Amino acid sequence: MDVIGRRVFLKSATMAGTAAALGIGPRARAAEFQYKLGTDAPNGHPVNVRLQQAADAIRQKTNGQVDIQLFPNNQLGGSTDMLSQVRAGGIQFLSIPTSILSVVVPVAAICGIGFAFKDYDAVWRAMDGDLGAHIRTQTRKAHLVAMERILDNGFRQISTSSKPVTSPGDLDGLKIRVPPSPLWTSLFKSLKAAPTSINFAELYSALQTRIVDGQENSLPIINAGRLYEVQHYCSITNHMWDGYWVVANEAAFDALPQDARQLVAESFASAAVAQRADILGLSNSLRPSLEKVGLVFNEPDMAPFRATLSASGFYADWKKSFGAEAWALLEKYTGALA
């Protein structure tokens, strides 16, 4: 890990709280359930730190009955590949961005509507409330089980190699990497950019070779992925919020004894709450660290971007796509969108 990442990630505290013991005897048993948990987050990212702690707690509290092995940094394949594997049962658990989950659960992407959430308070009220519950229900219909609390992938910022983004006009024709998601593609096309879908594992080389000129991610991801080595500008746009759902293969999750299922759910929920605090702290501390290694920051006015999206029909189109029920749940926490 880079020097910045090592210093910042070491600030992560031990996971807050543990689930109640299962009442199994003190002698550890051989693992009855050996499961894999894949993530696309780089080594050292709080997603992996907290999920490893959750897996350790699950193993300890079940006296080894449930052994969940963590495979970070796309070791089991790219995000879309791992999604296919967890649906087929080759992987039992997966930490997955909402943008990728939306491939099979379209409404999962609704939290990424451009400029919808004004702050974290609105995000957590929505995702821990009725909007998150609706997404989890739809995920079950796809034979996946989403854990109760979503992890934080942060508000997303735009980085570029050639010029800062100060207005919508700066995005005109910009070749920018986005996750393989219709919502991301639609957002940047509405802003007249040229979005290209590339898996995160291939992003660094794509920026290095100028296949794309820019990308958009949270500051912790920009840091952990060392993207500052191949980008020069970072515009604090806060244009979208994204999170990681921990999802399980339905059959694998339901095969666990009821008390083990409860413990797994509680452990991952505790991990998510702790990870959110990690990301908030990282986001607040990373900007000066990234400035020291050469990344140049600016803070554009968001009003022209919102006006461009409204005029393009972006909001109206996605309201039709997600449906009245889901859109009403979104606006319950964001207020009316243009």
Stretches found by the model and what they are:
Residues 2-122, 130-338:
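N-terminal secretory/targeting leader peptides
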